[in-house]
Amino acid sequence: MEIKVGSIVRSKAGRDKGDFFIVLAMDDNYVYMANGELRKVDQPKKKKLKHLQGTEQVSEFIINKLSQGGKVTNSEVRKALAQAGR
């Protein structure tokens, strides 16, 4: 499963193992992700790609907002994860 901005991913390693997050930004080896609760949008978790498992789900709302240069809020991240059943 390809991981991109707006993807819902599950952590495979670390103390957040098993938790779901939304990818907010990416670079070559790392993703920056938040869940709106413990990992807030203003301090996203930096994690290596190999420590993540992609899901089939993406948040179109988050993708659209970030692509238009908007700022995503913690409540929007929580809502997107809840709508995805996570």
Map each language-model feature to its residues:
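Ferredoxin-like alpha/beta domains used as RNA- or RNAP-binding modules
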Residues: 1-5, 12, 22-86
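Short, charged beta-turn/beta-strand-edge "cap" motif at the junction between a beta-strand
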Residues: 14-17
